[in-house]
Swiss-Prot record:
AB hydrolase-1 domain: residues covered: 20-137
Keyword Hydrolase recorded: yes
A GO CC term assigned to this protein in UniProt: membrane
Pfam families membership: Abhydrolase_1
Organism for this UniProt entry: Staphylococcus aureus (strain N315)
Enzyme superclass (EC): hydrolase
Domain of life: Bacteria
Region called Disordered, residue ranges: 57-76
InterPro entries: AB_hydrolase_1 (IPR000073), AB_hydrolase_fold (IPR029058), AB_hydrolase_sf (IPR050266)
Family per similarity comment: Belongs to the AB hydrolase superfamily.
Protein name per Swiss-Prot or TrEMBL: Uncharacterized hydrolase SA2367
């Protein structure tokens, strides 16, 4: 893996291929290796970069998180993630780059576009679970508060079951999300990673400071992506609302919420049709 030294962290990332830079931002998994099957499909067309977000995988913190980062209203980590992606983009290319964020990674991508638009050539938001600008934002914020409380008091299994039911996660995705790692060490790491995401991201990222105006001023750069196998899920409803209010197009893409793993060939074909 490659390394970029940043304030407070060593950011690690996979890099394959040639051509214009395309950065993938992972969601709850946090690690870029989930994009490697997709990267193989795109490496003849793009320099594909798949990031381990700070606090995840091979990326290392060199300074501790501030205590305030676990506050439900803290924007520290999502803003830090966005700054990391912008600094990575600048280190890799003198030109604006392509960016795709998936799930909570798409919320990071929104903050990249909002705060660092100069690094963005084109950007895609794949099924973002953000609620800040929705008419029923308070309802969804309260639901996420309840989910995190349940995880912290009743355990991860019960909380994630509620999470899946509340967001209407498709069966194809629920099955993959609940699949345990192959080794005991892997299962321990998986548990720690999911607990970290629960405490530091479910509430903070989904209710972070993004408005519809943040999209309209850059609408020519944005594509919304909804999976063909995750119809009816909350993240898709978010994209439908953005589309209705701004006119930014939605493109159907193969697979579900984890479509880049489930159907990497078809996922890549859509990206090449968009950006190739």
């Amino acid at each position: 893996m490659e390394t970029l030294e940043l304030q407070g962290a060593k950011l690690r990332y996979h890099q394959v291929g040639q051509g214009p830079v395309l950065i993938f931002i992972p969601g709850a998994n946090g690690t870029g290796n989930i994009f490697l099957p997709l990267a193989e499909q795109l490496k003849d067309h793009f320099t594909v970069v798949a990031v381990d977000r700070r606090d995840y995988g091979e990326s290392e913190l060199t300074e501790p998180l501030p205590d305030s980062a676990s506050n439900p209203d803290s924007d520290y980590r999502v803003k830090r993630d966005a700054q990391d992606i912008a600094e990575l983009a600048k280190s890799l290319s003198d030109e604006p780059v392509y960016i795709l964020g998936s799930s909570s990674g798409s919320i990071v991508a929104m903050h990249v576009l909002k705060d660092y638009p100069e690094v963005v050539k084109k950007i895609a938001f794949h099924e973002p679970p953000i609620n800040t600008f929705l008419p029923d934002s308070t309802y969804w914020k309260d639901k996420n508060d309840d989910i995190v409380h349940q995880i912290l008091t009743e355990g991860l299994e019960k909380g994630m079951k509620t999470f899946g039911e509340t967001l209407n996660i498709a069966p194809i995705d629920a099955k993959m999300m609940s699949q345990p790692a192959d080794t005991e060490e892997g299962r321990i790491e998986q548990y720690k990673r999911t607990m970290f995401w629960s405490e530091f991201e479910i509430r903070q990222y989904t209710h972070s400071d993004i408005t519809l105006d943040d999209f309209t001023k850059y609408s020519d750069k944005i594509t919304l992506l909804n999976g063909t196998d995750s119809r009816g899920s909350f993240p898709q409803d978010v994209n439908f609302y953005i589309n209705k209010e701004t006119g930014i197009p939605i493109v159907d893409i193969p697979g579900g919420h984890l479509g880049y793993i489930q159907k990497p060939e078809g996922f890549a074909d859509v990206l090449l049709n968009m950006w190739g």
